[in-house]
Amino acid sequence: QTRYNTLHFLFRLPPMMKKPAFRSLLVGLLLIALAGSFWYSPAWLQLCYGLALFLFGMQCIEEGLHNAAGGTLERLMASSTATPARGLMFGMGATFVLQSSTLVSLLTIAFLSTGLIGLAGGIAVILGTNLGATGGIWLLALAGQSVSLSPAAVPMLVFGILAGFLKGRFAAFGRVLVGIALIFIGIDAIKDGFQSVGGNLDFASIRSGGAMEVAIFSGIGLLLTVVLQSTHATLILTLAALAGGQISVTQGFAIALGSNVGSSISTAFVGFLGSERSGQRLALAHLLFNVVTAVLCLLLWLPLTWLVAQAAGWLGFNSLLQLALFHTLFNLVGLAVFWKLQARLAESLQRWLPDKAADEVLIPEEIPEKTMRRKQARYLSDNMLRAGDTALRAVFQEVRHLGALSLEVICHVLFIPAEMLYQEEEPLLEPPEPPLQLDAQALYENYIKAPYSELLEFTSKMDIDDEAQQQQLLQAHIAAMQLVEIVKDSKHLQKNMQHYLQKPDSRAYPHYLRLRAHLFKTMCLFRRAAAAPAGSEAWKEGSEALDRHVATLESSFRSRVFDKLRQDELGSWHTSSLMNDTNYAKRIGSGFQEILRVAGAVG
């Protein structure tokens, strides 16, 4: 699921290609071509088989750790980014375990976008992911081409599958064991594939010139990493090709350099397409780190490769260990450059990518129906689904966004400028000036139903096992559903509001003005209470003020209408309309009260 979501971000199809028939045809042709290539080259089939096992093993490890840890990963990351050194260590450890710097970077972007960690802490984690990627490469290089990992993988696979029949964390740890076993088997299959290719694939004989050769193989490393979504997978292929003699050491260095840039490009795509400003800043930081480091290493290419060759001669390193050493030096160069600049980099990123001006008014006062566009959810993206805490926080943020939209839709229904909601002092409402024209149904469908549908789709994809988090998600659903019902109730008010507020000579006119003012004050009180932290004194005072105001509808407004009816100042037709609309107003007030109670239960 995670890998599919990432590739979906990277390779968005043009509109014509989004048609199901065309997409099915394209996928079918690709599968036929791939099957034909397998028949033509058994060695290529062996390589793809090993790569598929490796990537699926990574996915198994990710899923297993997520299910075993619950919210531990989220809490660990939040506590591990308190200092730059701890953030660096967390990035190194997480990358070594998950075997994917891209995955850890995307997780970090998700945490940052929901406010679980700060930008400075996220930058430290990103620096750690690059160093963490070197750990697995050193182990594989030390194991060498002659050491087979499959004997260790077989018992792990057996125990992992057996554990999968159990429940809870045992099944999750079994999933991790299966993932590790598949990675081991996949690595052996990749090595066997390159051995089978033998002399049929010999890039080492290519000598196109120093700079051109480095550029070509750096591009190969970049493209491989973007497609495979894993620096580790690219470097394992490189190690296997290097051990089989298909590429030279210098070409391997260039592929390693390109793979680092490729991982940051993948992160940048997802970060910019599926994140708020904070996530975009971190994606840019990752891209800057790897691009600047790559440029420096290219400028220092000759002394850097000479240093690796000299160290290899002193220490007796083979070509595989030389690649691991170069990859480590590459990341150490970047760390040396950026470590002292983290704070300044964070400040620069804030300046380059400032927070988008928070539109006080989400819905313009005048919206031509022909140009009305559906409002999209603001905080929901597939990247937020990578961890339970980030997904839950994104849901809470989106419910708040839906709440703001709901208040503004009701303002439009009542013919009140939405910007009046955000004034510090409660403004004095003026009677609306005719003509009053508005389609409440169109407002509901475009500004409420559309983001609410996205919210429902997002929550259907969430995988949360923790009971406390499940309860919080349920409360968020209740709050969102209440907001939708409140807007639906307000739609019923529009017909009479639009009719009577354009007739100052009507007996019902002053009563609809008072009902309009009552509802506006209800919204203002709710907005102020909801803005305070749940359970705080300000929240309690705001909730009590709302309760008192809602109660006045029954004790004051309704009784006054009946008095006017008895005094023959209102006709029965007007009274019937006012009573019906008073019921809708009461339901709107009760809905706001219920949302505050839900917020208090969640905390």
Where are these regions (language model features)?
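Transmembrane helix-loop junctions at the membrane interface of multipass transporters and ion channels
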Residues: 27-44, 134-148, 163-166, 195, ...
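Cytosolic, long alpha-helical scaffolding segments
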Residues: 117, 143-144, 273-277, 305, ...
